[in-house]
Amino acid sequence: MAFHSLSYTESDSKIILIYGDSISAGYGMPKEQQWSEDLKELFLEENLNIGIENRSVSGETTGGGLARLGNILDQVNPHYLLIELGGNDALRGYPPKRILKNLNEMIDLAVSRNIRVFLMQIKILPNYGKRYQEQFESIYLKASEEKNVTLLPFMLDNIALEEGMMLPDGIHPNERAQPLIAQYVFDDLVPYLK
């Protein structure tokens, strides 16, 4: 009697492309401590045939992300796209309408290739002014509703204000936060992947 072990190769896996800025690029973390690596492990533990390709870039804006996306989709050929962009646009005070336009164009590009899109809500500090903060944060719901894509909660909601979870800059999560981010993202994604 022959026994066959069940193993998945990269070509068998459905690929999630993580496409974000320094938060998803694991700013200040060695690769093995980044939340995207922890997310890979969670998928393995649950025997989900999901691969992760992280093409996040520190400092990326929605405009830069839009400019790069076509080539990256050609290279990776993902089944799913998780967009975590916009924070750097807000840091530069870019108009919310421009950010929304860039997000919508990225979504359109992915959907035209039959890629399921997950859009991550981004939140910013109130020191940009309440009006700008509200306008900025509302674009994610607008984009998700206009384009009929899944809006995921901000991954730092339960982390950013927790003591001992952020780097000294107060913007980037530290090594203690990485597995928690992975678990939050995993819990938010899994219902849509089964």
Predicted regions and their residues:
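Active-site micro-motifs of SAM-dependent methyltransferase domains
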Residues: 24-25, 59, 124, 161
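Alpha-helical cap/lid subdomain in secreted, periplasmic
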Residues: 10, 64-194
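Acidic/histidine-rich helix-loop elements
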Residues: 28-30, 53-61, 90-94, 169-170
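Bacterial N-terminal signal peptides
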Residues: 1-2
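Serine-esterase "nucleophile elbow" of acetyl-processing enzymes
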Residues: 6-58, 68-77
